[in-house]
Amino acid sequence: MKDKTVRFITFTAMGIALVILAQLLGNVLPAGFTVVGPFTGKQLLTGSLVNCVLFVFTGAVGLWSGVIIGLLSSLLAYLFGIGPILPVVPVVACGNALLCLVFGLLRGKLSDWLNVVIAAVLKCGFLWLLVPLVVRAVGVPD
């Protein structure tokens, strides 16, 4: 039991470190080009790296490891000055947790590739719906 707990904590901490590293990497890149809609190249790279870490750690360490990494990474990114505005942090954290929950709960039922697609589409839809609502609610100018 003790070894499992130590492994869980150690790997989860490594996942948090990797997600923060991915966010820092995205922060040092130039503003970038628009890819599609509101997405920039920087956002696409950073988001893809973060999601990759969340998928890997959810699959390798467990569902709750991924959820913890997803929740804490958003808060830590904000505290380091690299995350979104404060009112959006809980929305992004919940989007990350949703990604991990969907992927983790579907594991073994469908192919991992299909699970990745389903989880990513749900997270994207969740963020596309809620982030603009939160931004408007707090009165952030366009």
Where does each model-flagged region fall?
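Loop-helix junctions at membrane interfaces
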Residues: M1-D142
